[in-house]
Amino acid sequence: MRFDDPMDEFKRNRKMEEDSKKVIDVKVAESDKGFAKFGKAEVPFHIPTLTKPQEEYKILVDNANNPFEHVLLEKSEDGLRFIHPLEELSVMDFVDRNLSEMRPVKPLPLEETPFKLVEEVKDLEDLAAALQSVEEFAVDLEHNQYRTFQGLTCLMQISTRTEDYIVDIFKLWDHIGPYLRELFKDPKKKKVIHGADRDIIWLQRDFGIYVCNLFDTGQASRVLKLERNSLEFLLKHYCGVAANKEYQKADWRIRPLPDVMKRYAREDTHYLLYIYDVMRMELHTMAKEDEQSDSPLVEVYKRSYDVCMQLYEKELWTRDSYLHVYGVQTGNLNAVQLSIVAGLCEWRDRIARADDESTGYVLPNKTLFDIAKEMPIVVAQLRRLLKSKLPYLERNFDAVISVIRRSMQNAAAFEPVVQSLKDRRPETVVEMNIEPKIEKTDTGASASSLSLEKVCVDDSKKQSSGFGVLPLKRKLESDKTVVEKNIEPKIEKTGTEASASSLSSKKVCVDDSKKQSSGFGVLLSKRKFESDNKVKEEVKVSKSKPDKVIIVVDDDDDDDDDESYEQSTKAADALDRVSETPSKGSPSLTQKPKTCNTEVIVLDDDDDSESREDEDMRRRSEKHRRFMNMKRGFLNI
């Protein structure tokens, strides 16, 4: 009966915790509760003035465009794959036994725990000896991805039940593997890591370390179905520690490490073994989902086993690598632009490998796409595109311009790729309906049963500029999507009381299959519905012919050239002439556009009993349409 006491005590503690909404009591000194007293993070994401550790500490890296060789692993008989040490072991070899006898070991307060900064080989030797004498230890790594091509481990934190260690990786780079490799591989020693997916492959890549017998607290939190899976949440939930995560993305290459960063690094592992204890108890008492499934504890070890079985693979450049750059698949690029993207991706990959920099540091994706869309062919144009300091681009302006020009000449080869990208995009429909909005100016007015059918625009080609969202139903090039939105037309009364009822118009289709070269795209909207481009729609209804609706669209985009302005003004003048003599007592049919960026769509209903005025309006509207078609034809030449 004595052996059941710890488990019974654990269950009672957890029940009390659930009832009182409190965590298990862990004595934590006031100074341990996060970093609040240290203020905001003083170390930014990137410190450009730092000497690269690869250069300062003579760290050798292999960025050649060849597969990564796991030189310490044996190969399969066919020579096609590497054999991980875990393949000789079973998950069940690591599952805890006799948990009913176990008590969670509460951690000492951070200030009372011995701490060692490992910077010399002798210190590393002492650490290895200390790990030989324990059954489990917690591990975490700090990493830098921005100033190196493959990534660079910057710091290793290790905690036992009694002591915390921080290993200065840079100073001991060539010694980490020889001293720690066998300890991480030892299946009898439990390694506790939170969210180990990346840590596992970083250890393989930089030090040839392969982990066996892992308990991943991140996987455990998922099996336990906790509210959140982050280490920050676990520290608060189980230990009452409010961890400050502002240093999570700090530049960990900095040396010497500030005290506040040392403290942050220690917190990542200091409490982890206690969290591991409590989680095991919870998993042990947790019911299985069904009879066929594994126990929750076994499930965590299976997931942890799978995490360890990952093998690092180097990123290789291929002819199609540019297609995997974020934004290419949905960027709606034409053949010339896509060719430039491919050329610049290859250029930055070559530079990044040679100088051991990330491709994002050499040429960020946003700048890459800006260049591809603007297609600068002289240095002055390229320089104007830069929004921030990019050293590699600034040192290689001429080379980049050469890449752009060469890519533009090779654009024809990318036509099939552009078509393939379009074909892959799913087609969706979003509807856009019109509901009338009635405004009174002098006397009351009413409107009912106003319905306008969909106006279809095929926007299957790129537009370089144009008006805001005018088409009520249209295809968006970016994702081969038909979008329909709700538009509320404004019905305005300017004279005596009038009413609009049963107003309807038929479907009007506009072919926007050609590229627009200026802002006078009239019916042609931008490919995306953007919140910052607010489109104003005004609908005015004629009393004499209430089934004619003129929609005036005003886009506040004033980036158009002088030619567009002149042509737009002519169109506005033509519109004025269409309706300069409205019938007596009827509301004004038009309103002079507020800016040059306006257009009119006349939606007609076939009616044989038209009045002379309506017939005149139809003829004038037809002239307007012909003018529009002529303009489109001019732009398509």
From Swiss-Prot:
The protein's role, per its UniProt record: Acts as an important epigenetic regulator through multiple silencing mechanisms. Involved in transcriptional gene silencing (TGS). Plays a role for DNA methylation in the RNA-directed DNA methylation (RdDM) pathway. Contributes to the methylation status of the retrotransposon SN1. Required for DNA methylation only at a subset of RdDM target loci. Plays a regulatory role in RdDM through retention of non-coding RNAs (ncRNAs) in normal cells.
Taxonomic source organism: Arabidopsis thaliana
Pfam families reported in the protein's UniProt record: DNA_pol_A_exo1, HRDC
Biased composition (Polar residues): 580-598
Subcellular location: Nucleus; Nucleus, Nucleoplasm
SUPFAM superfamilies per record: HRDC-like, Ribonuclease H-like
Name of the protein this chain belongs to: Protein RRP6-like 1
GO terms, molecular function: 3'-5'-RNA exonuclease activity; nucleic acid binding; nucleotide binding
Gene3D superfamilies assigned to the protein according to its UniProt record, in alphabetical order: HRDC domain, Ribonuclease H-like superfamily/Ribonuclease H
Disulfide-bonded cysteines: none
Biological process according to GO: exonucleolytic trimming to generate mature 3'-end of 5.8S rRNA from tricistronic rRNA transcript (SSU-rRNA, 5.8S rRNA, LSU-rRNA); gene silencing by siRNA-directed DNA methylation
Domain HRDC residues, every copy: 334-414
